[in-house]
Design a protein with these regions (language model features):
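Short alpha-helix C-terminal cap/hinge motif
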Residues: 1-34, 42
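Short, well-ordered beta-strand segments
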Residues: 4-10, 52, 76, 101, ...
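Alpha-helix/helix-capping structural signal
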Residues: 13, 140-141
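A late-sequence structural motif
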Residues: 17, 154-193
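Short beta-strand-centered segments that line the small-molecule binding cleft or hinge
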Residues: 18-22, 38-73, 86, 150-154
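C-terminal regulatory
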Residues: 25, 65-72, 76-133, 142-159, ...
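Short helix-initiation/N-cap motifs at beta->coil->alpha
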Residues: 33-42, 118-125
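Short beta-strand and adjacent tight-turn residues that come in two discontinuous sequence segments
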Residues: 35, 49-55, 120, 137-139
Length: 193
């Protein structure tokens, strides 16, 4: 029996189109495994995953890394928040007086003194802002995943997008691995690298 290819995917990543393409053209089965952003490299490093679709930045030491796509960042707030009146886009200047209920991954902080919030998941952060307390900035895909009727999201146009990438250990560079890389890059059985 051929061993399955085990691929982790970080919260919000969308591996479905690649999984469909893989299953249509390969004998090896594909096992998709959800991983959190905090633990996104653990399975690749310990060998329980062959590859992972991750959100950069990550420690790339000992890993191959192929960029897949970028995601815009969005501010999420209660429907009752002033942000709800804004157009589809805001800038960080529009957010300088806000309380971030979760630190932003880029390190950007509003100029307003920030309260000490306990660590919380993306879902917990959205529940907190839905209650009318503060704002959270997340990748669009994560905000969509946890969408609620009582929150709004606005693109933060001057924050760099986050990047989704495929990573795998440098010593694992076999045909199956390269075939999956090819699938993520749009290659078909009739094309080559």
């Amino acid at each position: 029996m051929i061993a399955p290819l085990r691929v982790g995917f970080v919260t919000g990543a969308t591996p479905d189109k690649w999984a469909r393409s893989w299953r249509a053209g390969r004998r090896e089965s594909l096992h998709l495994v959800p991983v959190t952003e905090a633990d996104q490299l653990d399975g690749v490093r310990d060998g329980s995953l062959d590859m992972a679709i991750v959100r950069l930045p990550v420690d790339r030491d000992g890993l191959h890394c192929v960029r897949l796509y970028d995601e815009v960042q969005v501010a999420v707030a209660s429907r009752e928040h002033l942000l709800a009146a804004a157009d589809e886009e805001v800038t960080t200047a529009d957010l300088v007086d806000e309380q971030l209920v979760r630190p932003h991954s880029s390190g950007w902080r509003p100029t307003a003194e920030q309260l000490e919030w306990p660590p919380m998941s993306e879902q917990d952060a959205i529940e907190t802002v839905a209650a009318g307390t503060g704002v959270v900035i997340l990748p669009m895909s994560v905000a969509r995943l946890h969408q609620r009727k009582d929150v709004v999201r606005r693109v933060v146009s001057d924050l760099d997008p986050t990047t989704i990438a495929l990573v795998w250990r440098t010593e694992r560079d076999d045909d199956v691995t390269q075939a999956f890389v090819g699938v993520t890059k749009g290659r078909t059985p009739n094309t080559s690298r």
